[in-house]
Regions:
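Structural signal for interior beta-strand "rungs" in well-ordered beta-sheet cores
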Residues: 1-182, 186-187
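Terminal amphipathic alpha-helical/low-complexity segments used for targeting or macromolecular assembly
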Residues: 1-5, 10-11, 16-17, 53, ...
């Protein structure tokens, strides 16, 4: 069903059983998959490819030009997976040619009211972005991450899978997998034990991750000192391997 007040470009590709409510605008080069719902006043622009079963609440702006002064009108892209929910007033921008020209959103994510995801971000699956989260350009977010309300993430930061930020957190460095941070100075607060339990991690795996956390944050080690210890632990603990590899590959440095 497409409401008569909505404007749909002739070049847009609209899938089966898509519901487009009043006063929506679908621009050129947009592709919307089957069973999506645009409630009302939703704008989708640019080279935006949207998967199946996504729901966009009113006043979402999807695939708009990036907020980067270097942007000069180049063709850039947005890809969104399946089964995502974008609540009221979410903004998701396309990429830039300075990166890979692509912003990519995975599947089964929940973007609560007024979330902003900037150009060139890569977001995985099953994440929750609480109200008023702002994610700056080039940020990479793993899977099953929870960003508390009003979290702000600096450009180029990476946030590992299963991480958690408290409400109002300001993230200026990389957040390793499993780690919780809070406050305006992104202070580590331990591992996301409750979240790991809910996701089926065994008690022994959680204990191994806790031991690895202590190596990084509680034993007085620098990152360089912690890495050999983590690598040794990772030989028998796959979940610690994920943590060790993340820390080793961090370009901005990890939260401390």
């Amino acid at each position: 069903m497409i409401h008569s007040s909505s404007v749909i470009s002739e070049s847009a590709i609209i899938g089966k059983n898509v519901q487009i409510g009043p006063f929506c605008i679908i621009g050129d080069n947009v592709e919307i998959g089957d069973n999506c719902v645009l409630t009302s006043h939703v704008i989708v622009k640019g080279h935006s490819k949207i998967g199946k079963n996504n729901v966009f609440f009113q006043f979402c702006s999807i695939g708009e030009d990036c907020q980067d002064k270097k942007y000069a009108g180049e063709a850039t892209y947005l890809e969104i997976g399946d089964d995502n929910v974008f609540r009221e007033s979410c903004t998701i921008h396309r990429g830039t040619v300075q990166d890979e020209s692509m912003t990519r959103i995975g599947s089964r994510n929940l973007f609560m009211v007024n979330t902003h995801v900037a150009h060139d971000c890569i977001c995985g699956d099953d994440n929750i972005f609480a109200n008023n989260c702002t994610v700056a350009g080039h940020v990479h977010i793993g899977n099953q991450v929870i960003l508390g309300g009003l979290t702000a993430v600096h450009q180029f930061c990476h946030i590992g899978s299963h991480a958690f930020t408290g409400g109002g957190a300001i993230v200026l460095k990389d957040v390793p997998p499993y780690v919780m941070v809070s406050g305006t100075k992104h202070i580590p607060q331990g591992i996301n034990s409750e979240g790991l339990k809910r996701r089926g991690f065994t008690s022994s795996s959680i204990m191994a991750i806790k031991r690895a956390y202590k190596v990084i944050y509680r034993n007085g080690n620098t990152t360089d000192q912690a890495l050999p210890i983590l690598n040794e632990m990772a030989e028998t603990e796959p979940d610690v391997r994920i943590l060790a590899d993340f820390v080793a590959s961090s370009k901005r440095g990890i939260v401390r």
